[in-house]
Amino acid sequence: MSWQVRNGWYFPLGCLLVAVAGPSGVIAFQQRTSQQSPRNASTPKLGDSKVNPIDGLRYVWIPPGSFTDGCSQGDKECFEDESPPRKVTLTRGFWLGQTEVTQAAYQKVMGYNPSVIEGPGYPADSISWVEANVYCTAIGGRLPSEAEWEYAARGGTTSARYGNLDEIAWYVHNSDFTSHPVARKKPNAYGLYDMLGNVLEWTDTWYWVQHNQENINPTGPSIAEYKELRGGGWWDNQDLVRASYRIRLETTDLDYDIGFRCAAN
């Protein structure tokens, strides 16, 4: 099968995108593609970015590496399910949305906007895991694992937050009880905005009360009752707006402080 390159994203020529009814009536997209890998793809590096031609959002390269996952040293606000901290190694780099998925992008891809707090540059909110997963699949991506999310959010730091909270995040003490347009606060060292605060972000990892003990490319349990969200939101107190904070919800749950960002291989 031949591959077409559009703005650095690989799409197989002749790919068939099929719409099917998913859970809760959501339209899902299934791609019938070859398993063949594109050839001669250059290896990206930290600082590289590209625009996805489908949703128009920018994605940044997160290189492989190791980090301490879970409760940060000296963090007195941790919950039991954030411990014990352990060294995790991600052997594969990945692309991650520079911002949370905006309402303009969501409308463009999905054809509707379920958000309660409306504005094209605001993060899409009131999004279930099912809908977030459909969106990321439709643009040729996926949701990040919880390990990928935390590694990217920390941006090479080892503390609970990657900067002064008021400078990097919208949370209950500075949000005026609403979300805000993306990328209005300072990014982390990887160039990612709003990894903490604004809206909670879905991951692709099933929640397990014991902190995952896998150390290499952890994926979590194969099935469980809840999916995991990260980052805290505009409604949360500062003790919940930390890199290691974990929250879980059912895949069809949604609220107006819940959004997401996509990853891609």
Task: Enumerate the language-model features and the residues they cover.
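N-terminal Sec-pathway targeting helices
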Residues: 2-15
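Acidic glycine-/aspartate-rich tracts in secreted/extracellular proteins
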Residues: 65, 72-74, 101, 113, ...
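Hydrophobic alpha-helical membrane-insertion segments, chiefly the h-region
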Residues: 17-29
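Surface-exposed recognition segments
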Residues: 75-88, 178, 196-265
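Short aromatic-cysteine micro-motif
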Residues: 50, 54-55, 79-157, 175-193, ...
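An exposed tryptophan-centered "aromatic clamp" motif
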Residues: 133, 148-166, 173-174, 202-205, ...
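GGW-centered surface loops in extracellular recognition modules
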Residues: 43-63
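Ser/Thr/Pro/Gly-rich low-complexity linker/stalk segments immediately outside membranes or between
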Residues: 32-42
